[in-house]
Amino acid sequence: MAQTQGTKRKVCYYYDGDVGNYYYGQGHPMKPHRIRMTHNLLLNYGLYRKMEIYRPHKANAEEMTKYHSDDYIKFLRSIRPDNMSEYSKQMQRFNVGEDCPVFDGLFEFCQLSTGGSVASAVKLNKQQTDIAVNWAGGLHHAKKSEASGFCYVNDIVLAILELLKYHQRVLYIDIDIHHGDGVEEAFYTTDRVMTVSFHKYGEYFPGTGDLRDIGAGKGKYYAVNYPLRDGIDDESYEAIFKPVMSKVMEMFQPSAVVLQCGSDSLSGDRLGCFNLTIKGHAKCVEFVKSFNLPMLMLGGGGYTIRNVARCWTYETAVALDTEIPNELPYNDYFEYFGPDFKLHISPSNMTNQNTNEYLEKIKQRLFENLRMLPHAPGVQMQAIPEDAIPEESGDEDEEDPDKRISICSSDKRIACEEEFSDSDEEGEGGRKNSSNFKKAKRVKTEDEKEKDPEEKKEVTEEEKTKEEKPEAKGVKEEVKLA
């Protein structure tokens, strides 16, 4: 399968400003706020100029029941913190309550996460983008009738079902530290979806993903599991990921790829035990992108939220084939990234328990399984079912140039490289970074002493205007789908 290096591809990105408001509860490791932090960081890096940004629609119950059972989705729609006592039996039945708590706006959170992934799949199907990104998606543990591992609705399965309307074969790759059990289970008996998961195995949630789990029936050999031990580093991960994925591409020949980019496989994750850097993690994105296939990039796990934001911002830049500086731009959550205020992280000194012999042995076993695959299966394509989302109306070329264009249309426009000056320094004084942030703190008190009250008033007004700018920009980017 042809590989290309550094090809610029069209990218669209889904984000809803409300997603950061949802709260699983005190002490719970899953924090949707990390999606807002990611969005704010990539805005301040200026990445929004190079891609189309959409606000996802809220997926409805009908869309969700394309995979999930009716009674499970009905339960998720009905349950609230104030009526939990009426649902105690169902909570047990659907595994809701501990890891997967009931919180305010639970169903709306699922709607946004799912809406972004399904809309991304529709965009890819219509060839309106090459890469679609939804960092609020990637909730890979949810089952047909059960919540699991902080996941309630499996947006990945629903997005893959949408892709299968147009694509004969879809490849799913999971680089979260946890096994992608919910997605594997959904497609365990089909040869149209291959699931490939690299994960920690052995006394670790969810406890599945053994090397010998290879699929069943028509799906035999279409589930690929690479069980790993603690402490895997960039070098070892790259040494297994590239050859395995090359062989998978050669044997399966997919026409679309879904990549779950769970960042709990990074060094220093609150729940993880791997030792990958952001660059090592992103090498997987880069490699999959090089096959030049329609690609859906999703979030997933990630519990040290400052590193989640760093990782997904950098991987958005990789998708855009854009280099961004290691020095973080000033942003709404700047203090989270101290004391170094840098984009990239260093690995720890933990031991890599994955010996070369162990990794080689697993790799050879997987190659043997992949050799058992028949040549890429042919599928008799039938009439294409209706898209999950109605087509957007209006042709930009036919619009009257004298009329003001809608916010939706203007936000879909991508700026040409030459349209802006080389400098990203917006506003007087330039874009703030760590050094002038610290300097500003030092001289603040001296400045205040010197200024007369009238001058102070003027400065306050100016600062107020500057502070409002990024927020306005963020709102501008959140576009409603037609």
From Swiss-Prot:
Residue positions, PTM S-nitrosocysteine: 261, 273
Question: What UniProt keywords are attached to this protein's entry?
Answer: Acetylation, Biological rhythms, Chromatin regulator, Hydrolase, Isopeptide bond, Metal-binding, Methylation, Nucleus, Phosphoprotein, Repressor, S-nitrosylation, Transcription, Transcription regulation, Ubl conjugation, Zinc
Q: How is it modified after translation?
A: Sumoylated on Lys-444 and Lys-476; which promotes enzymatic activity. Desumoylated by SENP1. Phosphorylation on Ser-421 and Ser-423 promotes enzymatic activity and interactions with NuRD and SIN3 complexes. Phosphorylated by CDK5.
Q: Which Pfam families match?
A: Hist_deacetyl (PF00850)
Where do Acidic residues bias regions lie? 390-400, 417-427
Which residues are annotated with the PTM Phosphoserine?
393, 406, 409, 421, 423
Q: What ranges does the record give for the region Disordered, renumbered to this chain?
A: 390-482
Compartments (UniProt record): Nucleus
Supply the enzyme class, top level. hydrolase
Coiled-coil region(s) at which residues? Answer: none
Q: How is its activity regulated?
A: Inositol tetraphosphate (1D-myo-inositol 1,4,5,6-tetrakisphosphate) may act as an intermolecular glue between HDAC1 and N-Cor repressor complex components.
Listed cofactors = Zn(2+)
Where does cross-link Glycyl lysine isopeptide (Lys-Gly) (interchain with G-Cter in SUMO2) occur?
Answer: 74, 438, 444, 456-457, 473, 476, 480
Where can the Glycyl lysine isopeptide (Lys-Gly) (interchain with G-Cter in SUMO) cross-link be found?
A: 444, 476
Residue numbers carrying N6-acetyllysine: 74, 220
Q: SUPFAM superfamilies, alphabetically?
A: Arginase/deacetylase
CDD domains tied to this protein: HDAC1
The record's tissue-specificity note reads: Widely expressed with higher levels in thymus and testis and lower levels in liver. Present in muscle (at protein level).
Name a single GO cellular component.
transcription repressor complex
Q: Does the keyword Repeat apply?
A: no
List, in alphabetical order, the GO biological process terms annotated in this UniProt record: chromatin organization; chromatin remodeling; circadian regulation of gene expression; circadian rhythm; DNA methylation-dependent constitutive heterochromatin formation; embryonic digit morphogenesis; endoderm development; epidermal cell differentiation
Q: Which residues carry this modification: N6-methylated lysine?
A: 432
How this chain assembles, per its entry, is: Part of the core histone deacetylase (HDAC) complex composed of HDAC1, HDAC2, RBBP4 and RBBP7, the core complex associates with SIN3, SAP18 and SAP30 to form the SIN3 HDAC complex. Component of the nucleosome remodeling and deacetylase (NuRD) repressor complex, composed of core proteins MTA1, MTA2, MTA3, RBBP4, RBBP7, HDAC1, HDAC2, MBD2, MBD3, and peripherally associated proteins CDK2AP1, CDK2AP2, GATAD2A, GATAD2B, CHD3, CHD4 and CHD5.
Q: What is this protein called?
A: Histone deacetylase 1
Write down the species.
Mus musculus (Mouse)
Name of the gene encoding the protein in the UniProt record:
Hdac1
